[in-house]
Regions:
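Metal-dependent polysaccharide deacetylase catalytic core of the NodB/CE4 family, i.e.
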Residues: 2-27, 149-152, 180, 184-274, ...
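A glycine-centered loop/beta-turn motif at secondary-structure junctions
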Residues: 8-10, 39-40, 56-140, 332
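Catalytic grooves of carbohydrate-active enzymes
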Residues: 110-111, 132-133, 139-141, 145-149, ...
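His/Asp/Glu-enriched short active-site or ligand-binding loop at hydrolase and phosphoryl-transfer sites
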Residues: 277-314
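Surface beta-strand/loop "capping" patches
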Residues: 375-419
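C-terminal beta-strand-rich structural cap/linker in extracellular carbohydrate-active enzymes
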Residues: 435-463
Length: 463
């Protein structure tokens, strides 16, 4: 958390012209376009009581006003009746830059540089302080359906009471058609992490006929089947993996499972079981979002880890800011919907009609600005993650030609400029993301990007 003070010397250094108050209560914040991808965004505390839990940003802050030579990226907002008497430029400044003779000073008020939220903000600062920036990204957009489908009619009494159908019936006739519709509207691809059964002690076994049905459905929908390592009741994770292995072997299916979901606390145990036949083809793991691991990394020498970026059900403003930041830094997301509570409800809100409505709303509202990036399954994303983690590159510029040299052909980069547009590209292709931001596909080891002749060179000190 950053707190600055104004004593003449430090005020000039940070660009602060006046300290109005050591602490004020905000009603929200406004992020201006340019620092992160995705455009301008307002995070105002919702009026509706059932939506107020979305607001989880830091709202108790000092009120700084900045002077000339600064550029503001985020400001605090008051309630409408208070804001009427305050000019926009006088609102509390939360993220800004002060141009100095030999560079720039960036200041952040609040905890916006915590966890992975820092990644895109720091890349944005680098861009703002430079004539241009170009950096490698993953370019993968993932949608993970965890603990779906299931093939055992467990907890039937409760499911029959709620839906008049069994677990397998609810999955096939209620949930699956809705998921198809949501995915078609979002232009994303699904990876469904199968949970053959949840309770390994109740004597109810999974039915392999449903496996055959879903594998055909996945193929039609360009979806992928993965393995879920979660369970409700078993003597151990190893027992669960052994029992699942027997089920898949008896189903006489030759499907190769390349992705598996595990809770963060179980990752080490899953890695220790990776030589078991069921898991031998798994090349990537996913887990819920955690600050203990990078967004994408190696879990072992041969297996990657792709963290979930957002929970499709419980969406907050800090989660949205983190998602935008990760998209800006990596061109990557992994949205999770865990369906275990549908089949094993904990409260009255664990109903599919409630979950489906909220999930669809969140997905189509918050992620739709990033459809310039590629929709992938987790195994497709895995290949791009490996390229990203292993790529080395250099870049240089001579007049209006930027030269990118990369050790990995078929790699992806983001180019960010200040008003310059791409006129031509050799050795690759480009897609405009938004104003001053381009997705670069390096198809060869050397890419030459010609931008239009700038009228004036960019000077970060005076923008």
């Amino acid at each position: 958390r950053f707190y600055a003070w104004h004593d003449g010397r430090n005020g000039c250094f940070l660009g602060i012209s006046k300290v109005i108050s050591e602490k004020v209560k905000l009603n929200g914040v406004k992020l201006f376009e340019g620092l992160l991808l995705g455009g301008e965004q307002i995070y105002e505390t919702p009026v509706k009581e059932n939506e107020k839990d979305r607001q989880d940003l830091t709202l108790d802050v000092p009120w700084y006003q900045v002077g000339s030579g600064t550029k503001t990226y985020m400001v605090g907002m008051f309630k409408e009746e208070t804001s009427r008497d305050i000019k926009n430029e006088d609102l509390p400044t939360l993220i800004w830059r002060n141009g100095m003779y030999r560079g720039s000073i960036f200041a952040v008020v609040g905890d916006y540089l915590k966890d992975s939220t820092a990644s895109g903000i720091l890349d944005g600062m680098l861009t703002e302080a430079s004539e241009y920036s170009i950096y490698p990204i993953v370019n993968a957009q993932n949608l993970s359906m965890v603990n779906f489908p299931g093939f055992a009619d467990e907890n039937n009494e409760e499911l029959m009471e709620l839906y008049s159908q069994s677990v397998t019936g609810v999955g096939r006739d209620v949930i699956w058609p809705t998921l198809i519709s949501i995915v078609e509207h979002s232009d994303l691809k699904m990876t469904c992490f199968i949970q053959p059964q949840a309770d390994y002690k109740d004597g109810i076994e999974p039915d392999s006929e449903f496996l055959e049905f879903y594998l055909k459905q996945f193929k039609e929908q360009s979806a992928e089947a993965g393995l879920s390592m979660e369970y409700k009741s078993a003597d151990s994770l190893e027992e669960k993996v052994d029992r699942d292995g027997e089920f898949f072997a008896n189903a006489d299916s030759d499907y190769r499972y390349g992705a598996a979901f595990a809770e963060e606390r179980d990752l080490t145990d899953v890695l220790n079981l990776s030589e078991i036949k069921l898991l031998k083809n798994v090349s990537t793991l996913i887990c819920e979002y955690t600050e203990k691991h990078p967004v994408v990394s190696y879990a072992s020498d041969s297996i990657t880890l792709q963290s979930v970026v957002g929970d499709g059900m419980h969406y907050t403003y800090s989660a949205d800011l983190r998602m935008r930041s990760i998209q800006s830094a990596l061109g990557y997301t992994n949205i999770m919907l865990n369906l275990q509570d549908i089949f094993w409800p904990q409260n009255e809100k664990d109903r599919w009609e409630i979950m489906e409505r909220r999930f669809a709303s969140n997905l189509l509202t918050y992620w739709n600005k990033f459809n310039c990036f590629t929709a992938t399954t987790l195994s497709e994303s895995d290949r791009r993650v490996r390229t990203f983690l292993n790529v080395d590159y250099t870049e240089s510029r001579e007049e209006n030609v930027i030269t990118l040299n990369t050790t990995k052909a078929d790699s992806w980069f983001i180019l960010r400029t200040h008003g310059e547009k791409i006129e031509d590209i050799e050795g690759g292709s480009q897609t405009k993301i938004e104003k001053d931001a381009y997705l670069i596909h390096a198809e060869d080891h050397t890419v030459k990007i010609q931008v239009d002749e700038p009228g004036l060179s960019y000077d970060s000190r005076h923008q």
